[in-house]
Amino acid sequence: MIQDSEFFRMEGVPITKEEIRAVSIGKLNLNPEDIVLDIGCGSGGMSVEISKRSKFVYAIDNSEDAKNTTVTNLKKFKIENCEVFLGDAKDLISEFDFNKVFIGGTQNIEQILEILKEKKIEKVVANTIVLENSVKIISKFEELRYNVDFVNVSVSYGKKINSGHIMLSKNPITIITATLK
């Protein structure tokens, strides 16, 4: 995994943290022939990491700052098998052929999941911070008859202080994995 500090960052544009990227990549179970859709690409951390492990990535975000930040990071890491799009994912999904999806954040999640089901997408991994969004996504996947697995990941970083070391926690992330039955 690329360290977070190596990515170009823009204020207000989120990035999936290194340890969360590692677990999410593992849950996607990528292979070199996969074509992946990254919805809510943010700073492009997942787009970069997925591109290194798959055939091609389509990245979408509705923020121009996020799109530009992702493009900058793709160039920085010399990634050529990823194309970035600005817009609403629910309006763009039908334009692409892909077999796996990573969702880092989006609006209209229930509509998007319905479209993914219609396209018979075999694996979707969605990361959430907000509990209500986790419940909404899990419930919708179950309604759509996906096999659903989820894990809540908490990461703490060590910091040296005068009297020793302490662990500083980051926000826990729920990683939801849905597999087509």
From Swiss-Prot:
<dbReference type="GO" id="GO:0019251">
    <property type="term" value="P:anaerobic cobalamin biosynthetic process"/>
</dbReference>
<dbReference type="InterPro" id="IPR041698">
    <property type="entry name" value="Methyltransf_25"/>
</dbReference>
<dbReference type="InterPro" id="IPR050714">
    <property type="entry name" value="Cobalamin_biosynth_MTase"/>
</dbReference>
<dbReference type="GO" id="GO:0043776">
    <property type="term" value="F:cobalt-precorrin-6B C5-methyltransferase activity"/>
</dbReference>
<feature type="binding site">
    <location>
        <position position="16"/>
    </location>
    <ligand>
        <name>S-adenosyl-L-methionine</name>
    </ligand>
</feature>
<dbReference type="InterPro" id="IPR023475">
    <property type="entry name" value="CbiT"/>
</dbReference>
<dbReference type="Pfam" id="PF13649">
    <property type="entry name" value="Methyltransf_25"/>
</dbReference>
<keyword id="KW-0489">Methyltransferase</keyword>
<comment type="similarity">
    <text>Belongs to the methyltransferase superfamily. Archaeal-type CbiT family.</text>
</comment>
<comment type="pathway">
    <text>Cofactor biosynthesis; adenosylcobalamin biosynthesis; cob(II)yrinate a,c-diamide from sirohydrochlorin (anaerobic route): step 8/10.</text>
</comment>
<protein>
    <recommendedName>
        <fullName>Probable cobalt-precorrin-6B C(15)-methyltransferase (decarboxylating)</fullName>
        <ecNumber>2.1.1.196</ecNumber>
    </recommendedName>
</protein>
<dbReference type="InterPro" id="IPR029063">
    <property type="entry name" value="SAM-dependent_MTases_sf"/>
</dbReference>
<feature type="binding site">
    <location>
        <begin position="40"/>
        <end position="44"/>
    </location>
    <ligand>
        <name>S-adenosyl-L-methionine</name>
    </ligand>
</feature>
<dbReference type="InterPro" id="IPR014008">
    <property type="entry name" value="Cbl_synth_MTase_CbiT"/>
</dbReference>
<feature type="binding site">
    <location>
        <position position="89"/>
    </location>
    <ligand>
        <name>S-adenosyl-L-methionine</name>
    </ligand>
</feature>
<feature type="binding site">
    <location>
        <position position="61"/>
    </location>
    <ligand>
        <name>S-adenosyl-L-methionine</name>
    </ligand>
</feature>
<keyword id="KW-0808">Transferase</keyword>
<dbReference type="GO" id="GO:0032259">
    <property type="term" value="P:methylation"/>
</dbReference>
<keyword id="KW-0949">S-adenosyl-L-methionine</keyword>
<dbReference type="GO" id="GO:0008276">
    <property type="term" value="F:protein methyltransferase activity"/>
</dbReference>
<keyword id="KW-0169">Cobalamin biosynthesis</keyword>
